[in-house]
Amino acid sequence: MEQTPQATDFLTPAPAEQPWQRPDPEWYKDSVFYEVLVRAFYDPDGTGSGTLKGLEEKLDYLQWLGVDCLWIPPFYDSPLRDGGYDIRDFRKVLPEFGTVEDFVSLIDAAHKRGIRIITDFPINHTSDSHAWFQASRTDPDGEYGDYYVWTDDPEQYAGTRIIFIDTEESNWTWDPVRKQYFWHRFFSHPV
């Protein structure tokens, strides 16, 4: 049975036929970066949204432009209430963009052209629909109970700057399920 690639698979060493060399830690200084929003870049099948496969189809063009590194903002499974930064599942790709296999294929194709890929991977918060947050809400003493910051006192850390003052009144939001306030640094839906 074929296994589905996982996000951690990208951290494994190169195949044995490619001798490992310590990468130049300053490679980025002379690189041409290109930020690409998957949704807006190239729609290969007329659905109205770009895909990882569409991005892969255009790698030769990006290489021709002189791009050395693609910077891809979040493309993970998300309810998209914060531009994809509110990740529901770090191990899945947003279905409209493709699959994990599509991402693996993109990485392989980019590397064959000497193009690096970096991604935004916001691990300091999740979507409020993430399984960890839902478990934290319903089982304070469970495995995920302390994955988030909860309090009975919304004045705790009162001096902390509110980043989005136009939309958020506090860094704390009341949760009627747990009957406590949860801490968030951005919007209340990516917690």
Regions found by a protein language model. Give the residues of each.
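Acidic/aromatic-lined carbohydrate-recognition and catalytic surfaces
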Residues: 2-191
